[in-house]
């Protein structure tokens, strides 16, 4: 039965009789081998339908349909552990493990998580979202079960993009040291989110160029069995040796493949045979991202994720902050040949496609290697260049030691464009940029800015670039507020806030709102409503800088302020409001103050607006918080 190739996303639920009978992998394992092709086809159709209903990650899931069917068919899940790296590709896994009818709720409020989550299912053995963690986690599980004298098979499914991170090789090295019973499935689709880059990608390409896909059907499972005389003697293993000098063998893994990752019959043979072996084993499978859906096969980057097919679209949308960054980057580079740009595998998401085409010799995609990205920039700065690192807030966490030790300690001239700061909606807690103020503002020499709109974002990026030292601009996901962007770039005064509005009332009482970044314009709306309702003067400040704070403005405003309110789209603990509290305490400025921001909890996915409402950071929530605080200040119960 050939693979079906679809050209449209179905709007009606497809007919899937075999899939509908599977609520547990045990029911899958009761089917005949010959029925697995139909299961895979039904699963692919259902993913197309479900993704169209809910949106979400797309191409990666279509690419692992046969692999997922084979894994759950061969291994005794959940007792045997499947550990998915990143989790973009976990939709087929969720569907086969009792969540078929819930899959259309994925990434929605109170729906299924975007990635595997331990609290959601016993089949989700490890919570993921960030890259390159699966082998470490899987090794930990394998060693724990060995220690408990209750061994099981542990299978880590890792993409070729994730294998570019050092953590993956640290884990493989340790697995060999412990002679752990561990299977790593290398899902090689020549992609991460963007195209894979670097020496490892070239190494995999060499295997393909010099070798060939191994066909177990031609020789049978005997070619995966250990030879009685020596460990690595099998024609199957030898095929990899002939294909290229093999990095995995050099580390100490027993290597098998490469296999066709869409041949479910062959994959079943391979996995059943591998269960009879012990020690660290790596199975190399080749898959196609977007498999079975023609548009996604042709353009896997665009179809990495999709929106709902029936999502309403309105008029003209303001530019995304990532696009504002990309335009600034090109403009700044045109004026200064010292500018080099670095991204850890997020060229498209960070808005750098235009720069990469316009300045290819000055563009460095270092793959999924955030630690390396930061120290690479430090080395460039040591030679008198001015590197710009474009990175998501949640991923900069992985380069924190390098930020401190390699950049800030040496006061090197590195600019950080920190994207996806704050809440990120449907991607949930693994991707939230909720902690960057806290982990950066404690670092000496750092300058931290947050723009209120897209024009200020451009000016802040220029300011950070002009600053002689480490400086960061953090901006949110999605579109700006719709203001005109000035082509001319201006260096802002370091550590200087601006008063956005002063709303005067008849009384002498005043509230001062110190707002940061994305919450400035929303806080202005709430403050205007409060002033109208309560006849109280309100001063709204765009703080601009988290570090250095505009301390003088706070001192001056304190003389007339009866209540301070700080507002930020960041964790309250350790955030910008905490910085204001610390300053006021040291200066002995004794004024009532409330801090509005993200609570001390991991926030589950919903739309961005829903999450803001739940946190009280929309205009209504901010207004309610100010009113409650004002009642306390005036001792009105």
From Swiss-Prot:
Pathway: Metabolic intermediate biosynthesis; 1-deoxy-D-xylulose 5-phosphate biosynthesis; 1-deoxy-D-xylulose 5-phosphate from D-glyceraldehyde 3-phosphate and pyruvate: step 1/1. Keywords: Isoprene biosynthesis, Magnesium, Metal-binding, Thiamine biosynthesis, Thiamine pyrophosphate, Transferase. The keyword Repeat does not apply. The keyword Magnesium applies. Thiamine diphosphate binds at residues 88, 129-131, 161-162, 189, 293, 370. Coiled coil: none annotated. Catalyzes the acyloin condensation reaction between C atoms 2 and 3 of pyruvate and glyceraldehyde 3-phosphate to yield 1-deoxy-D-xylulose-5-phosphate (DXP). Homodimer. This is 1-deoxy-D-xylulose-5-phosphate synthase. The lineage of its organism: Bacteria, Pseudomonadati, Pseudomonadota, Gammaproteobacteria, Moraxellales.
